[in-house]
Amino acid sequence: MAVPRNRLSNARKNSKRAHHAKKPKSLSICSNCGTARLPHCSCKACGTYADRTPTTQEAQ
């Protein structure tokens, strides 16, 4: 089993993890209603995805 040669101080340990922060989510703008939405997902406000309106089982 591997054993560390020297103990890392808290400052060195935390500075190694400085680049591990989460990146903010990139948002797209809905072309139908103009609200912010996640890319590759349907709009939560109007329900459109890729300029298509949602169809329900009742409508079919």
Curated annotation (Swiss-Prot):
Q: Name one Pfam family in it.
A: Ribosomal_L32p
Per the record, the GO terms for biological process are: translation
In terms of InterPro entries, this protein maps to:
Ribosomal_bL32, Ribosomal_bL32_bact, Ribosomal_zn-bd
Q: What is this protein called?
A: Large ribosomal subunit protein bL32
NCBIfam families this protein is in?
rpmF_bact
Would you identify the family this protein belongs to, as annotated?
Belongs to the bacterial ribosomal protein bL32 family.
Please tell me whether the keyword Repeat is annotated for this protein: no
Does the keyword Ribosomal protein belong to this entry? yes
Gene Ontology cellular component list? large ribosomal subunit
Keywords from the UniProt entry: Ribonucleoprotein, Ribosomal protein
The UniProt entry, under HAMAP family, shows: Ribosomal_bL32
Query: Which stretches of sequence are listed as region Disordered?
Result: 1-27
Q: Which domain of life does this protein belong to? A: Bacteria
* Basic residues composition bias: residue spans: 13-25
GO terms for MF: structural constituent of ribosome
